[in-house]
Amino acid sequence: MRKSGILMHISSLPSKYGIGKMGKSAYDFVDFLVSAGVKCWQILPLSPTSYGDSPYQSFSVYAGNPYFIDFETLKREGLIKKSDYEDIKWQDNDHQVNYSIIYNNCFKVLRQAYKTYKRDISKRYKTFVEKNSSWLDDYALFMALKFKNNGKPWYEWDKKLAMRDSNALKKASEELEKETEFFKFIQYKFFRQWSNLKKYANDKGVEIIGDMPIYVSSILIVSSGIKGTGPYLLSSNQ
């Protein structure tokens, strides 16, 4: 059976905050598709972007992009105040995404949300972490290490960490426990918002056609989300 569809990535939705988000504009777009009789919404990979900011080159094939988390939703949940994100200059113009601005500010807002949330970690959050531990633990630690190393690629880190030495990873996990929890929290909020948006679309009769990152880069090698993955399993020049 033939169906009509439109390609519109989350990043291209209208937003005052530099990049499209899973908030009102996303739900409005679903309503537009319904009114136009469009049955399929095609999107690009939802994974966090890496150097170059292509949705097809990511830190993980499992994780979601923090940039798409809607601030207004976090505000309604009581996790942040409007002043936490409204007073930030998110873009240079209305037609292009400035990823440097977003990178430098998005995590500040999300840290404020986490600071509020961690006072009362919910059962739902704990269930999410346990259910996704097969990839989430490695991903969160990788991101914590990447931030600690000022965004440098893994091959410029301490050699033992880069080669996934078990003792070095154990020590890093203990030292960066709070930071890894922050990145787990980000994924929890992403998938909560994404699940709600997807359900809304599906309930309205709109199917979502997804995609996945296909370019394995050197920064993906130790953060693919597969237990035991290390640079000795993949070659970055093949």
Stretches found by the model and what they are:
Residues 231-238:
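Catalytic cores of eukaryotic secretory-pathway lumenal/extracellular enzymes that build
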Residues 1-227:
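Acidic/aromatic-lined carbohydrate-recognition and catalytic surfaces
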